[in-house]
Amino acid sequence: MRDQVHRAIAIVGVGAVLPDATDAKTFWENISTGRYSISETPVDRWDPALYYDPDPKVPDKTYSKIGGWVREFNWEPLKWRLPIPPKVAEAMDRTQKWSIMSAREALLDYGYPERPLDADRTAVILGNAMAGDQHYKTALRIFFPEFTRELDTAPSFQALPEAVKRAIVEETMGQVREHFPSISEDTMPGELANIIAGRVAAVFNFHGPNFTADAACASAMAAFSAAISGLEEGDYD
């Protein structure tokens, strides 16, 4: 019995950002009412017309176009008085934003800041695989010269007048720059999976360990396991 008491882990606050639920209360209501939150892929995430084919043997396509999608969420760091400069926030993957939102909700649920906690002994341990989708968008912009180089080798493109070829490349580059994020010193920190936990720790000024566990589909369980082990060892509170 003593061992069971020693190993008990208290959940003192909860937060969530999930499909059809940008807070834990709404998520629980959705579960209670049996709400179904699986839907077709939104075009602004990835266009099924470009990437979907029902035949699983077709290369470079997916045979599924459904999933659980977080669509609209209220990201208001200035209103929440979070120390995130606008330019930094602009370069942040939505996964980092969701993590900060969930952490903020969990802290408020706990009673923070009226109910104190020891920031020096507060750890941030999250589970994530492959970060989010922001790095795909910046990669498309970065690698555009690779695509134009391959285009230059196509016989039908080579047969075009130089002015037409130049116009095609310049107009396409203009579209890429309009639709895909620019590259800055904030790009890489805004995309990396191992920055997610660090971002939460920095925003809320927590000084304990912070890291992101990546175990593919078991990332959440790996994070739980690591967090529980640290609590049991007294590494943090």
Question: What are the language-model segments listed below?
Answer:
Residues 11-15, 31, 103, 124, ...:
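Conserved small-residue
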Residues 39-42, 190, 205-208, 228-237:
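Acyl-CoA/ACP chain-elongation machinery
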Residues 129-141, 222-225:
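Short glycine/threonine-rich loop-to-helix capping motif typified by GTGT followed
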Residues 121-128:
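Extended hydrophobic secondary-structure segments that form protein cores and membrane-embedded regions
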